[in-house]
From Swiss-Prot:
Organism: Allorhizobium ampelinum (strain ATCC BAA-846 / DSM 112012 / S4) (Agrobacterium vitis (strain S4))
The protein, known as: Large ribosomal subunit protein bL28
Family classification: Belongs to the bacterial ribosomal protein bL28 family.
One GO MF term: structural constituent of ribosome
Gene designation per UniProt: rpmB
Gene3D superfamilies tied to this protein: Ribosomal protein L28/L24 (2.30.170.40)
Length: 96
């Protein structure tokens, strides 16, 4: 399981710990990932995704999983999220 968000693509970054004496040691900055179940209103199903806490806030801010995926840039999404986005686009196009 990779350490990256399925919705925003946020992943591991590297940097330095810097001491008071300015000694530098390498370290990793890990994203705050959560395993969550999100509901798609258009598809009427639940989906388990591994998302960052910031992405979860963005999903709630935009009004749900469907609205977030429709506005999201497809290059940042994981393959599962891309397939989900395409299903939502098809379903909303048929309904309209």
């Amino acid at each position: 399981m990779s350490r990256s968000c399925e919705l925003t693509g946020k992943g591991v970054q590297s940097g330095n710990n810097v001491s008071h004496a300015n000694n530098k040691t390498r370290r990793k900055f890990l994203p705050n990932l959560c395993d969550v179940t999100l509901i798609s209103d258009a598809l009427g199903q639940r989906y388990r995704l591994r998302v960052s806490a910031a992405a979860l806030r963005s999903v709630e801010h935009r009004g749900g999983l469907d609205a977030f995926l429709l506005k999201a840039n497809e290059t940042e999404l994981s393959m599962r999220a891309r397939l989900l986005r395409r299903q939502i686009v098809k379903k909303t196009a048929v309904a309209a």
